[in-house]
C-alpha cells in the first residue's frame, strides 16, 4: 500500500 505511505509522507 504505497498510497497510504505516500499520503502519510505528504502530511505536514
Swiss-Prot record:
Subcellular location field: Secreted, Cell wall
Domain of life: Eukaryota
Keywords: Cell wall, Secreted
GO CC field: extracellular region
Major localization listed first in the record, in broad terms: secreted
The protein's name: 33 kDa cell wall protein
Species, as recorded: Phaseolus vulgaris
Amino acid at each position: 500500500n504505497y498510497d497510504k505511505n505516500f499520503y502519510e509522507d505528504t502530511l505536514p
